[in-house]
From Swiss-Prot:
<dbReference type="GO" id="GO:0008360">
    <property type="term" value="P:regulation of cell shape"/>
</dbReference>
<feature type="domain" description="FAD-binding PCMH-type">
    <location>
        <begin position="24"/>
        <end position="197"/>
    </location>
</feature>
<keyword id="KW-0963">Cytoplasm</keyword>
<feature type="active site" description="Proton donor">
    <location>
        <position position="249"/>
    </location>
</feature>
<dbReference type="Pfam" id="PF01565">
    <property type="entry name" value="FAD_binding_4"/>
</dbReference>
<dbReference type="InterPro" id="IPR006094">
    <property type="entry name" value="Oxid_FAD_bind_N"/>
</dbReference>
<keyword id="KW-0560">Oxidoreductase</keyword>
<dbReference type="InterPro" id="IPR016167">
    <property type="entry name" value="FAD-bd_PCMH_sub1"/>
</dbReference>
<comment type="function">
    <text>Cell wall formation.</text>
</comment>
<dbReference type="InterPro" id="IPR016166">
    <property type="entry name" value="FAD-bd_PCMH"/>
</dbReference>
<dbReference type="GO" id="GO:0071555">
    <property type="term" value="P:cell wall organization"/>
</dbReference>
<comment type="similarity">
    <text>Belongs to the MurB family.</text>
</comment>
<keyword id="KW-0285">Flavoprotein</keyword>
<dbReference type="InterPro" id="IPR011601">
    <property type="entry name" value="MurB_C"/>
</dbReference>
<keyword id="KW-0961">Cell wall biogenesis/degradation</keyword>
<keyword id="KW-0133">Cell shape</keyword>
<dbReference type="GO" id="GO:0051301">
    <property type="term" value="P:cell division"/>
</dbReference>
């Protein structure tokens, strides 16, 4: 699919409802919304006197946001499409995708075209443009491992810039765009470097167990096998946002130093943990939440999912305030019981 042709026409949608634009399904209204299908429309927005002075929010799949109030500004609905191989060499393909492309569909497309690497990240909700902001990751792989570069528009000027990995400053579920660049840029396209020599990432027991259940030995697994296994695992563990509103994993897995981990393990020997290369230890946030008795519990119309404690859900009619109150209650209990601070992944507005 080619990248879209230039079209700087901009249509503003006043008093636009946002429930269909966030995976929690939370009701909120934007003063204006604009559907963005080409980068040139950002420059048009910058020149438009109706909205140039207003706060702006770029929204892709809405899988990483919790609206706690109406948005008194313009929501930019990123619908920039397109997927293509921009070049290849002896070692890799360089694949570009528009910021508004569905992430899971893009991963599936790369595999269908014989380009492996992203399969561990299958079925993560959201868009391609949101992936670098969060440095999405799952089952032993972070997006940054295959990231090459991206093009972003600075909202204040309408000018495009290219960012390499160093400039993006990726961290664990983190990047420049969540820190210094937060709210300043819209990601137009992302380019990935997918090596022609595929190396499977099978360090997570869930994946190898699923492969085994399918009669596939890990050393014989193809990229498609891993993709199918990850999809099956996620569908079994995580609710479909179209059925039960949610934003996937609500909390980051906390990373603590060795001394804090030793103290924690002395109190809770069964704590689920993952040693990190730098000597720190990553904890399973879902395990901490479950041990505090939150799995399946609710506050108002917001609840903790009954199969995955890391997921908060909208049981119907929940407000952003309901979700935020539930998240804060969980954070307080985990801090009290384990001395560990949980950080929310979604942005609360």
């Amino acid at each position: 699919m080619p990248m879209p042709l230039d079209d700087s026409t901009l249509s503003l949608l006043p008093d636009h409802p946002l429930a269909a634009h966030n995976t929690f399904g939370i009701a909120a209204t934007a003063r204006f919304a604009a559907r963005i299908t080409h980068a040139s429309q950002f420059e048009a927005l910058h020149r438009d006197p109706r909205v140039a002075h207003l706060p702006q929010l770029v929204l892709g799949g809405g899988s990483n946001v919790v609206f706690t109030r109406d948005f008194d500004g313009v929501v930019l609905l990123d619908e920039i499409a397109g997927r293509r191989v921009v070049r290849e060499d002896d070692d890799a393909w360089y694949v570009e995708a528009g910021g508004g492309e569905n992430w899971h569909a893009f991963v599936a497309w790369t595999l269908e075209h014989g380009m492996a690497g992203l399969e561990n990240l299958a079925l993560i909700p959201g868009t391609v443009g949101a992936a670098p902001i969060q440095n999405i990751g799952a089952y032993g792989l972070e997006m940054k491992a295959y990231f090459d570069s991206l093009v972003a528009v600075e909202l204040a000027t309408g000018c495009s810039e290219r960012f390499d990995a160093a400039r993006c400053a990726f961290g664990y579920r983190d990047s420049f765009f969540k820190r210094e660049g937060r709210g300043r840029f819209a990601i137009v396209s992302v380019t990935f470097r997918l090596p022609k020599q595929w190396v499977p990432r099978l360090g997570y027991a869930d994946v190898t167990r699923e492969l085994d259940a399918r009669g596939i030995a890990p050393d014989a697994a193809t990229a498609r096998d891993v993709f199918d296994a990850v999809v099956a695992i996620r569908r079994a563990k995580l609710p479909d946002p179209l059925v039960l509103g949610n934003a996937g994993s609500f909390f980051k897995n906390p990373v603590i130093d060795a001394a804090q981990f030793d103290a924690l393990r002395a109190r809770a020997p069964e704590v689920v943990s993952y040693p990190q290369p730098d000597g720190q230890v990553k904890l399973a946030a879902g395990w901490l939440i479950d041990r505090c008795g939150w799995k399946g519990r609710a506050l108002g119309a917001a609840a903790v999912h009954d199969r995955q404690a890391l997921v908060l859900v909208n049981r119907g009619g929940a407000t952003g305030a309901d979700v935020l109150a539930l998240a804060r209650a969980i954070q307080a209990d985990v801090q009290t019981q384990f001395g560990v601070e949980l950080e929310a992944e979604p942005v609360c507005l």
